[in-house]
Amino acid sequence: MTKIAEKSKQEYGDLLKEKDHLQDMEQLEMTIVSIQTPYPSIVRIQGKINTLQPELWQAPNLAIRLIVSNPPEGQPISRVYTVRSFNPINAQIEIDFVKHEDLSPAMEWLNSAQVGTKIGLIGPRPHFIPNFTAKKHVVMFADDTAVPALYSILKQWELGISADIFIESFEKDIASQLPELEHVKIHSFHKEHHTSQKGLLLKAAFALEHYENITIWAACERNEARALRQFFLEDQQLNKNDVRIAGYWRDGVSSSELDKLRAQHYQEHIQQGKTLNEYDDLDLAN
């Protein structure tokens, strides 16, 4: 590893420890109590956490950082995942992993995980939910990586709010385990494995019947997320508070490399005197 790479890795680890980044998050240990495969491409892990603040874990769309590797030299390697659910009675959380063929640090850990395995984590960090305050029709876009976020949001859905939810997935019945709610319609787009087909969510956005009195929530691949944001903010001129979009991963870029780019961008952000609450990950040019 070059000195530049070492410096970048060290700076990233330091950034994760800063007060602005940690805020009210806990640094905990999770013990796996169950491993299931609800779909061929998804592994669901249930783990018990030793939280002293269970109230922090009951909000929808919470993100955590799992310490998937602790190399003898250098910084721990971590990955961000969404908490699908939290049970306050037994302090257990559910996390879904989308399986990949490459042996990334996360997949190596997942392949070795078994009941009783312990892993460190940092969290939870609340991520955005749809803008329910104006009582507008909600339109949501998600790929496989965002289905746990969808699940947690639907479990705490605002009464009386209508929605159309578009899901792009490798699994034909991905919506079968999502809560069924009145006035909420789910549209699933099945994507074959190893296909080069892209942009299904963006095409769905282009095909909406109207763009008045709607509010947007989306989480998917970064390039598509950025295109969705541009379409709704610039082309349709929706209010920024009604366009809540996140890019969870980037096609062709490893999570390690993406984390480095995010760290550099976040460092520039805080050097300008800004805070985490003002940070928009999709402003990252790469």
UniProtKB/Swiss-Prot annotation:
This enzyme's EC code(s): 1.16.1.10
Top EC group: oxidoreductase
Gene3D superfamilies (alphabetical): Nucleotide-binding domain of ferredoxin-NADP reductase (FNR) module, Translation factors
A single GO molecular function term of this UniProt record: oxidoreductase activity
Cofactor(s) essential for the protein: FAD
Superkingdom per UniProt: Bacteria
Recorded catalytic activity of this chain's protein: 2 a Fe(II)-siderophore + NAD(+) + H(+) = 2 a Fe(III)-siderophore + NADH; 2 a Fe(II)-siderophore + NADP(+) + H(+) = 2 a Fe(III)-siderophore + NADPH
Annotated residues for binding of FAD: R79, V80, T82, D96, V98, H100, D102, S104, A106, R250, G252, S255
Coiled coil: none
Record-annotated FAD-binding FR-type domain positions: 25-131
Matches recorded under PROSITE patterns: FAD_FR
Pfam families hit by this protein: FAD_binding_9, SIP
CDD domains: siderophore_interacting
Keywords, alphabetical: FAD, Flavoprotein, NAD, NADP, Nucleotide-binding, Oxidoreductase
Free-text function comment from the UniProt entry: Ferric-siderophore reductase involved in iron removal from the siderophores after their transport into the cell. Interacts with the siderophores acinetobactin (Acb) and preacinetobactin (pre-Acb) and catalyzes the reduction of the ferric iron bound to the siderophores to ferrous iron, resulting in destabilization of the siderophore chelation complex and entrance of ferrous iron into the intracellular pool of bioavailable metals. Can use NADH and NADPH as electron donors in vitro, but the reduction rate is very slow, suggesting that NADH and NADPH are not the physiological partners of BauF.
Record note on quaternary structure: Monomer in solution.
Family from the record: Belongs to the SIP oxidoreductase family.
Protein name in UniProt: Ferric acinetobactin reductase
Organism listed in the record: Acinetobacter baumannii
Lineage: Bacteria, Pseudomonadati, Pseudomonadota, Gammaproteobacteria, Moraxellales
